[in-house]
Amino acid sequence: ELIVVDNNSSDLEHRKYLNDLRNKGIVKLYQNNLNQFTFGLNECLKDLGDSRSLIAICDSDFLYPEPLDGECWLSVLVREMQKSPYIGKLGLSISLENIKNKKHLKSLYKREKEFSRLSLNNNVWAAQVDTTPALYRKDLFFWGKFRLYPGHMTANKPYYHIGRHKKIIGYHMGWDNDEYISKGPIVSVSKIDSFALYGGGFDRAVV
C-alpha cells in the first residue's frame, strides 16, 4: 500500500497532482492543515494498526538509486532486515556530492562522512538515519505504538541498531538548494512549535 502524507503544502500544482493520484486509486492520501513535521504522519500510522512488521517512510525530496543487481532499494532493505534481526531501522546512504564543496555546510559534510566509518555488517554502516528513506520495525520505539515525534531517534529500544545500507546510495535534493541554510523563514512556525513541544533540536545549519 502506497500512502502519501501532505503536510500543508502551499504549492497548488503539487496539491492538484496528489489529488489526481488519489482519485485514480494510485495512492491513499492524508492532507494535514498544519506542517507539524513528524506529527503529520501519526494519523496515518494509527490507521495502519499493528498488521505490518516493517514500515517504509520516505521523504519527498529524495532521488532513489537504480536497482542493485535487479532489485529495487526497498527489496534490498527488506531482505537485509530479515536476515539481521538486530537492526531496528535501516536507511539508504546519501550521496555527498552536492554538499562537499559548500563552505556553509562544512559541519554537515563532516558529520555525514563520519557515518561511513563503523560497520554493523558487510552491507550496513552503523549510522544515524534522519533525512533519508528508511525501513522501520514496528516495535522499534520504547513507547510501544509505532508513532513518530521530534527526537524519536533517541527513543529506540537498546537492543536495536540503526544503520544505512552501504550499497544503496540516494541523493538528497534538499541539499541542492542553498535556502536549506538560514536565509529567511524557511521553517514554518507550526513545525517549530512541534519541536518545542517535545524538546526536539534543530541543526544549526537549518534554522
Feature-to-residue mapping (PLM):
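Short, well-ordered coil/turn elements that cap or connect secondary structure elements
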Residues: 22-24, 50, 84
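A generic signature of intrinsically disordered, low-complexity regions enriched in glycine/proline
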Residues: 10-15, 36-39, 46, 63, ...
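Short aromatic/hydrophobic "clamp" motif used to bind/position activated sugar donors
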Residues: 55
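Acidic donor-binding segment of Leloir-type glycosyltransferases
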Residues: 1-34
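Conserved catalytic core of nucleotide-sugar-dependent glycosyltransferases
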Residues: 37-41, 45-48, 63-148
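C-terminal catalytic/acceptor-binding lobe
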Residues: 111-207
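Active-site acidic Asp-centered loop
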Residues: 7, 58-61, 66-67
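Poly-acidic low-complexity segments
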Residues: 11-13, 52, 72
